[in-house]
Amino acid sequence: MASYDLVERLNDTFRQIELELQTLQQALSSCRLLAARVFELPAVSKDAEHDPLANIPVVQHSGKAALALALRHYSHLFIQQQSENRSSKAAVRLPGAICLQVTAAEQQDLQARIQHINALKATFEKIVTVDSGLPPTARFEWVHRHLPGLITLSAYRTLTPLIDPSTIRFGWANKHVIKNLTRDQVLMMLEKSLQSPRAVPPWTREQWQSKLEREYQDIAALPQRARLKIKRPVKVQPIARVWYASEQKQVQYACPSPLIALISGSQGVSVPDIGELLNYDADNVQYRYKPEAQSLRLLIPRLHLWLASE
């Protein structure tokens, strides 16, 4: 059970995040808006929160309307702020960018504010995921007991400032989470599951135990040096590619929230060129670079566990 002091830290840190976000919103609102473009994505219903996304239609907003949506999005932290039918597990995303004219002093101040908010968010995430000492399955209940309706991913999600960018382009990224494992590491994982027998619908406890035993035997039969990897697909993500002319470099950013471009004019940039985000269509994905696929054989589908050929 998490201690009273930890609960106090959880609540205090979250209150600080809320307060700092409100102050940041006021500071951003007082700056001159140069340009803004955000891309509204369709809400994910509770019934479809685990479904793969084959198509994502995008609705574009620009100017003051885009700025208002962006400022509201930064503080969208609770499910009470959205429709009852909307999934509380699927991330609320609003890719895009707001570009604000600032003095050198304002740029420095806003950077410091954003950095402080991101540090608070990192502290909050650490309290939940590390300091609580709770397994992932118990964290949700613990957090929502003290902060009912919190969208934890939105609370963790950091803000991204851009300093005098020249161009901002948007796109979609298809990714996999890949983790290389040894045979013995996988056997240890399965052994832990075998030592904690339980029912996993639609299987009874006995059926699930039998399934685990078969999986264990299949992995134990592999050579000790077998190359195993967990390769799990991640839902398609909006990204931004930002070009900095003064440094002659391009940087790619994850873009679940509007980027905050602060334009001081010191790098010769007036208004950055902001591109658009096209609708996502899984059947027409164009890869900039697609390496030759490694030969893999699926061993345990539920774990996304694959065996790589030698």
From Swiss-Prot:
One of its GO terms (cellular component) is cytoplasm. One of its GO terms (biological process) is DNA replication termination. GO terms for molecular function: DNA binding. It is found in: Cytoplasm. Pfam families: Ter. Keywords: Cytoplasm, DNA replication, DNA-binding. InterPro entries: DNA_replication_term_site-bd, Tus_dom1, Tus_sf. Belongs to the Tus family. Trans-acting protein required for termination of DNA replication. Binds to DNA replication terminator sequences (terA to terF) to prevent the passage of replication forks. The termination efficiency will be affected by the affinity of this protein for the terminator sequence. This is DNA replication terminus site-binding protein. It comes from Klebsiella pneumoniae (strain 342). The lineage of its organism: Bacteria, Pseudomonadati, Pseudomonadota, Gammaproteobacteria, Enterobacterales. The gene is tus.
